[in-house]
């Protein structure tokens, strides 16, 4: 009987220790400005798509669900990203997956001053060429976020814009 009571006490102590949300510290909350439902627009005003951003896994992961506004070659492009702050490396990370079979792993990222900047160091394009991808999210105000995707073919010395989107919160 004593062993049973001791086991229950140990279980309850462990439960109370884990009941504190491990991802509630400020560094985990740096990207919360992106949570919500959005329409994304290119600089020319054309709608690029819709994105739903939610918080999952006990507030440890930010999930993006993207759907393009228009079909290309009969396919409506869609994808998901999983964004998280890695407590061990003190870096933001993103894994992007889409319905064309592509993935991108952004294993380095930092958050500060209303920005999250990711880097994917090992990206290969359709021609088999390696390059670096940089992805920057900037909070413009409470209802607007800029997402800028860039690539570098020279190890990060110069950058070329791949896309530039302004996310506008759906009302």
Describe every region a protein language model picked out.
Residues 19-171:
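Hydrophobic small-molecule pocket/channel-lining residues, especially in calycin-type beta-barrels
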Residues 1-22:
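Bacterial Sec-dependent N-terminal signal peptides
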């Amino acid at each position: 009987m004593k062993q049973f009571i001791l086991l229950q006490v140990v279980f309850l102590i462990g439960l109370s220790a884990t009941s504190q949300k491990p991802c509630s510290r400020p560094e985990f909350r740096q990207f919360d400005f992106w949570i919500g439902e959005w329409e994304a627009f290119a600089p020319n005003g054309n709608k690029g798509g819709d994105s739903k951003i939610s918080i999952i896994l006990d507030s440890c992961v930010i999930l993006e669900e993207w759907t393009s506004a228009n079909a290309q070659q009969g396919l409506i492009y869609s994808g998901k990203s999983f964004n998280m702050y890695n407590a061990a490396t003190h870096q933001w990370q993103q894994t992007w997956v889409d319905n064309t079979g592509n993935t991108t792993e952004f294993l380095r990222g930092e958050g500060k001053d209303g920005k999250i900047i990711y880097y994917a160091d090992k990206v290969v394009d359709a021609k088999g060429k390696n390059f670096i991808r940089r992805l920057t999210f900037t909070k413009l105000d409470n209802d607007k976020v800029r997402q800028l995707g860039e690539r570098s073919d020279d190890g990060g010395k110069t950058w070329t814009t791949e896309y530039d989107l302004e996310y506008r919160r759906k009302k």
